[in-house]
Design a protein with these regions (language model features):
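Structural alpha/beta core scaffold segments of enzyme domains
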Residues: 1-208
Length: 208
């Protein structure tokens, strides 16, 4: 299955040199994607080519190990984050500089860089936000949309900093988080609409 039928159609047309209107990509029901179905992959093009050459349907089946080998991994990330807070424990601002290693091809590098900045603006209220990002090319396998791309790495860094900041203010880290959570139906500083924020309920349940 694929999550990007039109994207795949475009690349099949380009690589196989077939007019776009003569290519039809049928997307069956997709189960879990987790980033492994959001890029055109070599095996999709190879099976199409083999089908043309043999004039027969061609099916490609991977073992679980082969799935992990063929999929694109998570971007190694170098992050520099600075968070400010007042004496009452209210976050006053966040400044970030993030460099991601995307490997030898573009894939989802631009999107991952974008998500790094957008998703750092929640789930806390941040009124002042600075963000710079760089996606680098290196002589490594390409990286892609691996499970929560653009969210997991900077979120880890942010939560570590919040713990450190809480301790420096002699505040309980849970109290600090509760004080700064964005309520439902609000906008982040970058105008991302937050319709719900269940993290606060999760935190309360853990404390109880």
């Amino acid at each position: 299955a694929t999550q990007v039928p039109h994207y795949l159609q475009k690349y099949l047309s380009k690589v196989l040199e077939i007019p776009l209107h003569k290519i039809r990509v049928i997307k069956p029901v997709v189960g879990g994607g987790f980033g492994g179905k959001s890029d055109p992959f070599p095996h999709e093009i190879i099976t199409s080519y083999l089908s043309i050459k043999t004039h027969r349907p061609v099916k490609c089946v991977f073992t679980r190990e082969e799935v992990f080998i063929s999929n694109h991994g998570r971007h190694p990330t170098k992050m520099t984050l600075s968070v400010g807070a007042d004496k009452q424990g209210k976050i006053t601002g966040l400044d970030t500089d993030i460099v991601i290693d995307g490997g030898s091809y573009g894939s989802f590098g631009v999107v991952t860089s974008y998500y790094n900045g957008v998703l750092l603006q929640g789930p806390y209220r941040i009124n002042e936000f600075g963000f710079t990002t760089t996606r680098t090319y290196t002589n490594k396998p390409q990286c892609g949309a691996m499970r929560g791309h653009g969210a997991v790495n900077p979120r880890y860094a942010m939560e570590v900093i919040i713990d450190e900041l809480s301790h420096s203010l002699k505040m309980d880290p849970c109290d600090f988080r509760e004080k700064n959570f964005l309520p439902a139906n609000t906008l982040t500083v970058g105008q991302l609409r937050i319709t719900s924020n269940g993290v606060l309920d999760c935190l309360k349940a853990v404390r109880e």
